[in-house]
Amino acid sequence: MAGEAVSEHTPDSQEVTVTSVVCCLDSVVEIGHHVVYSVVTPLIVAVLIDTMAGEAVLEHTSDSQEEIVTTVVCSVVPLVCFVVSVVCFVISVVEIGHHVVYSVVAPLTVTVAVETIAEEMDSVHT
């Protein structure tokens, strides 16, 4: 699906290459740019998945968790993070059918998935 974010989130300081337009905090992110982020507080993960009945549900957890992504959407929970370097990058693997594993180390809200119009960015502000 065009516009899917495909970068992986890990609970450590990390530098990644942006491979698609993604949600971010107060920063312009373009494809091909390098983004440095760091997780420094307790972690809350929001995952949007489909139930057997086809209803979309938002799953919250404070423990390590693995889910299969069945719907690609932007998380509706507010983002709370502390910017340590260039930008706080809070995107996880969001290709449909992919397994996503979350290692919870500290609280931070993670935007799990986002679908954007080509060359456009969705911004989420605190």
Swiss-Prot record:
Residues 1-28, 97 are cytoplasmic. The keyword Transmembrane applies. It is a multi-pass membrane protein. The keyword Metal-binding does not apply. One of its GO terms (cellular component) is membrane. Keywords: Membrane, Transmembrane, Transmembrane helix. Residues 50-75, 119-126 are extracellular. It is found in: Membrane. The chain crosses the membrane at residues 29-49, 76-96, 98-118. This is Uncharacterized membrane protein YAL064W-B.
